[in-house]
Amino acid sequence: IYQSYVSVVISLIIILLINDCISKISVKSIFKNGMQGIGMLIGGGMVYLVSLKVVVAVTGQKLASSYNGLTNMSQIASSKLFTFIQNAYGDWIASFISPEAAYIGGLLKVANIAVLCFVIGGLIAIFIDKNLNMLNKIMVFVLAAVLPIGMNISCILSGGMVHVLMRYSFWLFYAWALLLIQRLKHSILKEKKRFKYMASGGAVLSIAILIVIWNNFQAPNAVY
C-alpha cells in the first residue's frame, strides 16, 4: 500500500477540512488547519527526499528509470499536466461507475451510484442550509471538487501509469460518505423536512458498502 500513502494523507486532510466547514468552524481555523496539512506534506516530502539521497549515496545504487521509477517524475512535461488532471478525474469516476467485479458487476455499479447520489444530495443539503455561511459552503464545494484529485494524485505523479494498489485511497470515499451523512443527520437534515429521506442514508450507504466489500471477497477468491 506504500504506493498510495501520499494519496491517503491528502484525502484525509481534505475530508477533515470538509468536516470542519460543515461543523461551522471559523474560516480562520479552517485555513490554519489547511496550512498545517500542507506543511505536513511538504515537511514529509523533504524528509523523504533527503533520506532518499542519503540512501543512494551510501549504497551507491541508482534510482530506477523504468516503469514507475522516481526519476520518471521529473520527466513529466508540465504541458501535459492538464491532461493528467483530466485523466485522474476520468480514472476516479470510471472506478466507481464501471468497477471491476468478479460476479456482481451490475449490482456493484448500482451500489456505487447510490453512494455517489447520496453524496451529491448531501452537498445540495449543505448548499441550501441557511445557518451555514456562504464562504463555508464555497469551501465545501471546492474541497469536494479536488477530493478526487487528492485520492488519485498518483495518476498525475506517475504520468497515468496507475494500478489497483495505487488507488487504495479511493476507499476513503465510502468512509467520507458515511461521515458526511452522519454530520448532516445531526445538524442540517433535522431542520430540513424536504431532505428527511436522507436521514436514513446511513443504513442505505452501509448496505451499498457491504455489497462492495462482498465483491472484494469474491474478486480475490476468483483470481486465486
Short names for language-model regions:
Residues N112-V115, R183-I213:
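Signature aromatic-anchored transmembrane alpha helix within multi-pass, membrane-resident enzymes
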